[in-house]
Amino acid sequence: MQNQRIRIRLKAFDHRLIDQSTAEIVETAKRTGAQVRGPIPLPTRKERFTVLISPHVNKDARDQYEIRTHKRLVDIVEPTEKTVDALMRLDLAAGVDVQISLG
């Protein structure tokens, strides 16, 4: 698997979960002899919602909610066969979305 790269993008609502998952991925890749670049923090997406709390009148009474989507990027340069096998067997937290691309 010479001259290859594995790019892993992680998304989560909880920054503690995503940091824990990236630490597991980096530690697994380094243990199997691959070179790791990252984790690189990508911009956090903030979605804001405004909801009227009054059922009929009083437009001034509103609640505001926010959902933050945290993102990280990890590049694994020149992965070995052991690296790919270890990453496939890795069990990450349920609240983390993982996208893997080969390049």
Curated annotation (Swiss-Prot):
Keywords: Ribonucleoprotein, Ribosomal protein. One of its GO terms (molecular function) is structural constituent of ribosome. GO terms for cellular component: ribonucleoprotein complex; ribosome. Part of the 30S ribosomal subunit. Belongs to the universal ribosomal protein uS10 family. The gene is rpsJ. Gene3D superfamilies: Ribosomal protein S10 domain. Involved in the binding of tRNA to the ribosomes. It comes from Actinobacillus pleuropneumoniae serotype 5b (strain L20). GO terms for biological process: translation. It comes from the Bacteria. This is Small ribosomal subunit protein uS10.
